[in-house]
């Protein structure tokens, strides 16, 4: 009987009739997280969190473990898929005003921070050259914190440099954080269904709703099939497309790579960090590039929820999207002109979007009164 009730709830869950494909990314993210937990579990069975054996254990997984190459590639490329989906999911939230459902938005932003931390810890685990140096650069930012910085860095490293204790605790954190993500995802979904999802028009959906099943289940399944097909195509034909060539060499603390950079999904934040010549200023800008999302629900001034009928805001949104891509691109380049100038201008425009959002809303309200 309880199972029937659950199915009834799922089947009769009322959803707005007009939600578009942009609303499918939530279910895709859920699938990504399930895939990551499963593949990660099998990888953890064969991985060794030791600086002398970590790199060799990855090679052992790929070469000797049955379907180990598939697990490793699904896990690595699955992380990229996860971030593609989450960035689209956030962009949809910004465009259609989903952030006005404050509890859902704040829990979602917390999820993003947890996901970024998990991905960072995971990037260090293969103990390749780029893994080691990316970890060194990013964890070193803690030293910019006045008074506490050096103590916190030593505490995080488990010593006076990145070494075996660092790798062990990063593996422990990479293993435990996904369980926190799953718990918070459940809360995120519960909070969403407390108020119900918005729709492209930004109007009240209560007047026109349909059952979730079969309409939206099939709609979700189509996008999931497309995502899994794309994932398997990349895994089969281009498994190293997102990898850094330096990471195919074992970590060597005595040799610094020519250009240190994290995974592609962190490049926008890394580009903002690099654009500021001051260490503390850069660390603050890096933190703010993500934390600024927390302020969005509290700075909405427009009488319209969605950007669908706000042409000025649409222009600003797509400029913001282009800015995001430009910062990502400049972060892959060396720290030299013209890339430094471009990244500084792009970083400024990135934050200007969040500042001009309430100003534009206020101006639109004035125009509508005329």
Swiss-Prot record:
One of its GO terms (cellular component) is mitochondrial inner membrane. Signal peptide: none annotated. Belongs to the cytochrome b family. One of its GO terms (biological process) is mitochondrial electron transport, ubiquinol to cytochrome c. Its main location: mitochondrion. It is a multi-pass membrane protein. Binds 2 heme b groups non-covalently. Component of the ubiquinol-cytochrome c reductase complex (complex III or cytochrome b-c1 complex) that is part of the mitochondrial respiratory chain. The b-c1 complex mediates electron transfer from ubiquinol to cytochrome c. Contributes to the generation of a proton gradient across the mitochondrial membrane that is then used for ATP synthesis. Heme 1 (or BL or b562) is low-potential and absorbs at about 562 nm, and heme 2 (or BH or b566) is high-potential and absorbs at about 566 nm. The chain crosses the membrane at residues 25-45, 69-90, 105-125, 170-190, 218-238, 280-300, 312-332, 339-358. InterPro entries: Cyt_b/b6_C, Cyt_b/b6_C_sf, Cyt_b/b6_N, Cytb/b6-like_sf, Cytochrome_b, Cytochrome_b_C_euk/bac, Cytochrome_b_N_euk/bac, Di-haem_cyt_TM. Keywords: Electron transport, Heme, Iron, Membrane, Metal-binding, Mitochondrion, Mitochondrion inner membrane, Respiratory chain, Transmembrane, Transmembrane helix, Transport, Ubiquinone. This is Cytochrome b. The cytochrome bc1 complex contains 3 respiratory subunits (MT-CYB, CYC1 and UQCRFS1), 2 core proteins (UQCRC1 and UQCRC2) and probably 6 low-molecular weight proteins. SUPFAM superfamilies: a domain/subunit of cytochrome bc1 complex (Ubiquinol-cytochrome c reductase), Transmembrane di-heme cytochromes. Pfam families: Cytochrom_B_C, Cytochrome_B. Heme b b562 binds at residues 75, 174. It is found in: Mitochondrion inner membrane. A ubiquinone binds at residue 193. The lineage of its organism: Eukaryota, Metazoa, Chordata, Craniata, Vertebrata. Its cofactor is heme b. One of its GO terms (molecular function) is metal ion binding. Heme b b566 binds at residues 89, 188.
């Amino acid at each position: 009987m309880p199972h029937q009730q659950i199915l009834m709830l799922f089947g009769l869950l009322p959803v707005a009739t007009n939600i578009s494909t942009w609303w499918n990314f939530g279910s895709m993210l859920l699938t990504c997280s399930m895939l990551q937990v499963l593949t990660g579990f099998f990888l953890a069975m064969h991985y060794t969190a030791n600086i002398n054996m970590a790199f060799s254990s990855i090679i052992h997984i790929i070469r000797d473990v049955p379907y180990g190459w598939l697990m490793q590639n699904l896990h690595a490329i699955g992380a990229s898929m996860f971030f593609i989906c989450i960035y689209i999911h956030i962009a949809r939230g910004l465009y259609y005003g989903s952030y006005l459902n404050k509890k859902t938005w704040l829990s979602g932003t917390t999820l993003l921070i947890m996901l970024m931390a998990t991905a960072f810890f995971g990037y260090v685990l293969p103990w390749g050259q780029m893994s080691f140096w990316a970890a060194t650069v990013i964890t070193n930012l803690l030293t910019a914190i006045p008074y506490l910085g050096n103590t916190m860095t030593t505490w995080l490293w488990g010593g006076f440099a990145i070494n075996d204790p660092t790798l062990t605790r990063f593996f422990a954190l990479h293993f435990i954080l996904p369980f926190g993500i799953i718990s918070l995802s459940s809360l995120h979904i519960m909070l969403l269904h407390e108020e119900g999802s918005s729709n492209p028009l930004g109007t009240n959906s209560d007047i026109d709703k349909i059952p979730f099943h079969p309409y939206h289940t099939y709609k979700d399944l189509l996008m999931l099939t497309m995502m899994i097909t794309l994932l398997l195509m990349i895994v089969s034909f281009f498994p190293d497309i997102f990898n850094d060539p330096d990471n195919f060499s074992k970590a060597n603390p005595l040799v610094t790579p020519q250009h240190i950079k994290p995974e592609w999904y962190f490049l926008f934040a890394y580009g903002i960090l690099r654009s500021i010549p001051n260490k503390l200023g850069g660390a603050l800008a890096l933190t703010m590039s993500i934390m600024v999302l927390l302020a969005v629900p509290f700075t909405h001034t427009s009488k319209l929820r969605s950007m669908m009928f706000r042409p000025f805001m649409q222009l600003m949104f797509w400029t913001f999207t282009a800015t995001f891509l430009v910062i990502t691109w400049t972060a892959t380049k060396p720290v030299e002109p013209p890339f430094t100038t471009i990244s500084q201008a792009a970083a400024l425009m990135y934050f200007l979007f969040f500042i001009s959002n309430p100003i534009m809303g206020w101006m639109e309200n004035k125009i509508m009164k005329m």
